A protein has these predicted regions:
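Conserved pre-motif I regulatory segment
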Residues: 7, 200-237
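Pre-Walker A (Motif I) flank of P-loop NTPase domains
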Residues: 229-236, 261-263, 315-317
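Inter-Walker segment of RecA-like/P-loop motor cores
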Residues: 286-317
């Protein structure tokens, strides 16, 4: 068995690392510490004992839910900030809940918190909290949300994603080390830039001196100049055959290096165009560094590494 404290610590640190790019490490770390607090309950420990053939007749093993305890602690101790954590903790196995409403009477978070409020009185939970809560502190949110609906919602979803991914990966590392090792490590985007531009420059030199190729070179140069600007929304309008894929990728590499971005993500409206784009990028970056992920992907092209990468988009492109 993996000790609860070890799992919580591992998930906390991994989630914090995932949240570092959007300055939310402390929030994600506390999510990791709280997410399985309910597993300290006597009833959950009885459930584990029964499931492993160990006698434990003193407690009811039928109730083995565990996500409510951390959510209850967060809302009780941290107020409005705690509700943000509560959404993520309560939903880390089943999806983010609504505050009110929901498909079932107790599916909404408000109802769940009211129903499970007594979980914090469990002696085991009390002991666990007493041993750890001195370190459970939060800074102010890293953003000022002018649009509290959309901005706050997206931030909660990002925190939730950090928690879910960290929880899954730490459990996988403990339960299935071979699968975890199969995830491999990908090169940083910066490491792919040099071979990409070397091949792109060579392709441009080999191209015959035609008017079309002159315009393609101008488009690429314009894209690379635009990459020096501050992050935001950019528009590229080029006729068919104008070299959009490679010019846009050149922009993406330059912009990522300039502003410390870690991924290039293509979101394209037709699977046929996704396939063409992915094939082009593989020629420049190699098969292993480009993840093609859409509903029409041919399973025969999949490898174990690509299936694992599709779970959390770890590939650089």
């Amino acid at each position: 068995w993996q000790p609860l404290e070890a799992h919580a610590a591992n998930v906390a640190e991994m989630a914090a690392a995932f949240a570092r790019p959007f300055a939310s490490q402390a929030w994600a770390r506390l999510l990791g510490e709280l997410h399985d607090l309910g597993k300290a309950r006597r009833s959950f420990q009885a459930y584990l004992s029964r499931a492993n053939g160990l006698a434990d007749a003193d407690y009811d093993a039928s109730d083995h839910s565990h996500s409510g305890a951390g959510a209850c602690w967060a809302t009780r101790k941290l107020g409005a900030a705690g509700r943000i954590l509560a959404y993520c903790v309560a939903g880390h196995h089943v999806g983010l809940p609504d505050w009110i409403g929901g498909e079932t009477p107790n599916g909404a978070l408000a109802a769940r918190l009211a129903e499970e409020a007594g979980v914090l009185d469990d002696p085991n939970v009390k002991a666990y909290v007493a041993a750890h809560e001195a370190a459970w502190r939060l800074p102010a949110p890293p953003f000022r949300f002018t649009d509290k609906g959309m901005g706050l919602s997206l931030w909660i979803r990002m925190l939730y994603s950090c928690l879910v991914d960290a929880d899954f990966l730490d459990t996988e590392a403990f339960m299935d080390a071979r699968r975890a090792e199969g995830r491999g490590s990908y090169p940083a985007l910066d490491d792919l830039a040099a071979p990409f531009f070397a091949e792109l420059d060579a392709k441009q030199r080999r191209a015959p001196a035609t008017e079309v190729n002159r315009v393609r070179a101008e488009i690429r140069a314009a894209c690379e100049r635009a990459a020096e600007e501050m992050p935001g929304l950019f528009s590229l309008t080029v006729p068919t055959g104008g070299g959009k894929t490679l010019s846009a990728t050149a922009f993406a590499f330059r912009h990522a290096r300039k502003h410390g971005k870690r991924r290039i993500i293509y979101v394209i409206p037709y699977t046929s165009i996704i396939e063409q784009t992915a094939d082009t990028l593989r020629q420049f970056l190699g098969d292993a560094n480009v993840l093609e992920h859409h509903s029409n992907f041919d399973p025969e092209k999949e490898t174990q590494a690509s299936r694992l990468a599709a779970e959390n988009w770890d590939a650089p492109v």
